[in-house]
Amino acid sequence: MSQNYYQILGVSKTASQADLKKAYLKLAKQYHPDTTDAKDAEKKFKEINAAYDVLKDEQTRAAYDRLGHDAFQNQQSRGGGGNHGGFHPDINDIFGDFFSDFMGGSRRSSRPTSAKVRGSDLKYNLTINLEEAFHGIEKNISFSSTVKCDTCHGSGSEKGETVTTCDACSGVGATRMQQGFFTIEQACHKCQGNGHIIKNPCKKCHGMGRYHKQRNLSVNIPAGVENGTRIRHTGEGEAGIRGGNSGDLYVDITIKPHDIYKVDGANLHCKLPISFVNAALGGEIEVPVIEGGKVNLTIPAGTQNGDQLRLRSKGMSKMRSTIRGDMLTHIHVEVPKNLSKRQRELLEEFKKESINEKENDGSFFNKMKSLWS
């Protein structure tokens, strides 16, 4: 009793299409006449191909399961189907599929590309300042690209001319030729793999359906954009070949360093110089903010050099949000270098008072002891 197609491939009747393909590729590699000298290799290889040709199609597989092996073969014989003759799939195709499935490799198809080809994506580096990043801005950019031909409207054919299907390959773009055990597929020599013939190419774009041009485009930069943000503009890349879809334009944002602020996410940091009098007595001073103008910042009495004071919601805006970050001021107490006579007298008096207080409470000597203990 002859084996059924499932037995030939070594799988169960409930095997998935993926399991069928794996089994076929493994056996085809093993028994292909070009890879083995076994006497029964050609016969075995034909059986494997016949089995897979039936089972890989859901409709024919269902008919096979319903009729059974013998009845299905008889019906195929009467209908003239199932005759593979001396045809052998290209061993390179089998190896390509095998390594793609089992070795994790990528296979490059030998089939030519279609006439329509998608345009390439473009990248544009745009530098903005921090204020522009905070508020958001619309920028006009200029770049070289390919655009859809306005004479042939992307078809590649001279105005009024039609693009005809290649009669040599019937629009497939490839021709197949059998030589012994091998089937060779190559790009159609008549249409160069396009599948179509342009009898009268457009003079402006030379049959490509596009041409090079310097483009100007207005791009919207949203408020709160961060350094390194990439903004995609769909369809604004290079035009496709012969009516293919356009690629995309990616605008990469770089924010210039600021003279006052340093950015930390949505927070801003700045160095704030104050006099030692303000640090000691406290008070209010005006500080600039990123949105423009100034706000009052309260300096607590006794503020030390290096202290950090926070202005809430005075940092950067956030994309697609009403929430803002904070501004953190880092205090830098400035000591005057040039004193008037009166200022010196007052400071000398302050010095004496300070020494007496330290001596009376002993804190000065206690601090000194702690440094040496």
UniProtKB/Swiss-Prot annotation:
Q: What is its main location?
A: cytoplasm
Q: Which cofactor does it need?
A: Zn(2+)
Output the superkingdom of the source species: Bacteria
The record's remark on the cofactor is:
Binds 2 Zn(2+) ions per monomer.
Chain ranges of zinc fingers (CR-type):
136-214
Write out the annotated subcellular location: Cytoplasm
Q: Name one GO molecular function term.
A: unfolded protein binding
Keyword tags: Chaperone, Cytoplasm, DNA replication, Metal-binding, Repeat, Stress response, Zinc, Zinc-finger
Q: Which GO terms describe its biological process?
A: chaperone cofactor-dependent protein refolding; DNA replication; protein refolding; response to heat
Transmembrane stretches in the record are: none
- Which positions does the entry assign to CXXCXGXG motif repeats? 149-156, 166-173, 188-195, 202-209
Q: Which residues bind Zn(2+) 1?
A: C149, C152, C202, C205
Looking at the keywords, is Coiled coil present?
no
- The UniProt record lists the J domain at 4-68
The residues listed in the UniProt record as binding Zn(2+) 2, with positions renumbered to this chain, are: C166, C169, C188, C191
Known InterPro entries for this protein? DnaJ, DnaJ_C, DnaJ_domain, DnaJ_domain_CS, HSP40/DnaJ_pept-bd, HSP_DnaJ_Cys-rich_dom, HSP_DnaJ_Cys-rich_dom_sf, J_dom_sf
Which GO cellular component term is one of those annotated?
cytoplasm
Please name the Gene3D superfamilies in this protein's record. DnaJ domain (1.10.287.110), Heat shock protein DnaJ, cysteine-rich domain (2.10.230.10), Urease metallochaperone UreE, N-terminal domain (2.60.260.20)
> Which HAMAP family does this one have?
DnaJ
- Domain note for this entry? The J domain is necessary and sufficient to stimulate DnaK ATPase activity. Zinc center 1 plays an important role in the autonomous, DnaK-independent chaperone activity of DnaJ. Zinc center 2 is essential for interaction with DnaK and for DnaJ activity.
Q: What does this protein do?
A: Participates actively in the response to hyperosmotic and heat shock by preventing the aggregation of stress-denatured proteins and by disaggregating proteins, also in an autonomous, DnaK-independent fashion. Unfolded proteins bind initially to DnaJ; upon interaction with the DnaJ-bound protein, DnaK hydrolyzes its bound ATP, resulting in the formation of a stable complex. GrpE releases ADP from DnaK; ATP binding to DnaK triggers the release of the substrate protein, thus completing the reaction cycle.
Under the subunit heading, UniProt states:
Homodimer.
Q: Which family does it belong to?
A: Belongs to the DnaJ family.
Q: What is this protein called?
A: Chaperone protein DnaJ
